[in-house]
Regions:
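Conserved catalytic cysteine-centered active-site region
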Residues: 7-8, 40-95, 137-141, 208-234, ...
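Active-site pocket-lining segment
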Residues: 145-147, 183-185, 191, 262-331
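Condensing-enzyme catalytic core mediating Claisen C-C bond formation in acyl metabolism
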Residues: 1-7, 124, 151, 210-276, ...
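Short, well-ordered amphipathic alpha-helical segments that serve as non-catalytic structural scaffolds
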Residues: 10-25, 50-51, 79, 142-149, ...
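Glycine-/small-residue-rich "gating" segment that lines the acyl/pantetheine channel
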Residues: 106-143, 206-228, 233, 379
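N-terminal extracellular/periplasmic Venus flytrap/periplasmic-binding protein-like
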Residues: 5-15, 23-26, 159-252, 315, ...
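Conserved beta-ketoacyl condensing-enzyme motif
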Residues: 5-74, 78-95, 100-118, 127, ...
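Active-site-proximal alpha-helical scaffold in enzymes
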Residues: 69-101, 144, 150-179, 241-248, ...
Length: 379
């Protein structure tokens, strides 16, 4: 219920794609864009093919193919993978990939009512939790899996709170120094009365957060556990998008090549161990590309829970000074379908700032999968 509460997921997606087109100096009707692939998880009530709604809302031609992806938290990074596949196969030359989510506007569901209820009460089901945050295999909230990885990898409460505080500090520093400016844009939100309200920054960043203050919060999912509202990601509305193109075509259009996509993969583990799924995903990319963990300059992991980020860094051996340099979902938020390309873009921003040559981004996703992508900046 933040500043974007009055905007739908499609509204957010449309604004984001319009801004991408503006920055790339693309006339929407020029037919330069071959396809739009967009992720969204909470699609109930949104209408047919939300990606198509975004494309037409942004002014792209009716001839533009559009695909909506639901791979839970990995949706938009999977959209980027699918776009890369099409470009590599020679099918298309330029694709917009991204994702969107309005967790605020996810509806309450009245399941089973098409057949009717003869007697007794009916119960509303929160589609945000039911479709986005619930492990259907073990019938538990995803927060429980944050507790599972903490126990499995020996991540204590103090370590989690210290990581969460660092995420807040790094995000605040990035905003203060303008490091997010290249990847964000201001949004004017219409009001019922008066002028629109301009939103220029993430609402969840809290610069004054300390590990000590976080230590005062009670566990949420297990009374004897360690996952709290302060060391977990937040519920958010947002959208993100990238332009994926064949290199020579990008050059011919005058587009800056920010990075090249070298490799990507999806891994799988037991659903209850979902938070550990990025570990084999990242290790697969390292092995397949003949890399040691220290051969990669920057890593970006979606901070669904601080316990998960701590475990991923610990088990792979990623140094603190290469991991989530501008903060992550604990501070910036986690609008499910938008987070994949948001993480990719944030990592690219950190790579630009530090002049890093390479990076790996990864996200876990409900059901026991994880997605990961390896990129390099042009020399």
């Amino acid at each position: 219920m933040g500043a974007y509460a009055s905007l739908s997921a499609v509204d957010l997606g449309v604004m984001t794609v319009k801004e991408l087109l503006r920055r790339a100096n693309i006339d929407p009707q020029s037919e330069v864009i071959d396809e739009v692939v967009f992720g969204q998880v909470l699609q109930a009530g949104v209408g047919q093919n939300p990606a198509r709604q975004v494309a037409l809302g942004a002014g792209l031609p009716v001839s533009t193919p559009c695909t909506t992806v639901n791979k839970v938290c990995g949706s938009s990074l999977k959209a980027a993978m699918m776009a890369a596949n099409s470009v590599r196969a020679g099918e298309y030359k330029a694709i917009i990939a991204g994702g969107m989510e309005s967790m605020t506007n996810a509806p309450q569901l009245l399941l089973g009512q098409r057949k009717g209820t003869k007697m007794g009460d009916s119960t509303l089901v929160d589609s945000m939790i039911h479709d986005g945050l619930w492990d259907v295999y073990n019938d538990v909230h995803m927060g429980t899996t944050g507790e599972t990885i903490a126990k499995e990898c020996g991540i204590d409460r103090e370590t989690m709170d210290a990581f969460a505080a660092r995420s807040q500090h790094r995000a605040a520093e990035a905003w203060e120094n303008g490091w997010f400016d290249w990847e964000t844009f201001a949004v004017d939100v219409p009001q019922r009365r008066g002028d629109p309200v301009r939103i220029e920054k993430d609402e969840g960043v809290r610069p004054g957060t300390t590990a000590e203050s976080l230590g005062n919060l009670r566990p949420v999912f297990d009374k004897d556990g360690s996952v709290t509202a302060g060391n977990a990601s937040t519920l958010n509305d947002g959208a993100s998008a990238v332009l994926i193109a064949e290199a020579s075509f990008a050059t011919s259009q005058g587009w800056e090549i920010i990075a090249t996509i070298e490799d990507y993969c999806t891994s799988g583990v037991e659903p209850e161990r979902v938070m550990s799924a990025p570990i084999p995903a990242v290790n697969t990319l390292l092995s397949r590309n003949g890399l040691d963990v220290l051969d990669v300059d920057v890593y970006e992991h979606n901070e669904a829970f601080a316990s998960a980020s701590c475990a991923v860094a610990q088990e792979i051996g990623i140094p603190e000074d290469r991991f989530n340099l501008h903060g992550g979902a604990v501070s910036l938020g986690h609008p499910l379908g938008a987070s994949g390309t948001r993480c990719l873009i944030t990592m690219l921003g950190a790579m630009r700032r530090t002049n890093a040559a390479s990076g790996i981004v990864t996200l876990c996703l409900g059901g026991g999968n994880a997605v990961a992508m390896y990129v390099r900046r042009p020399e």
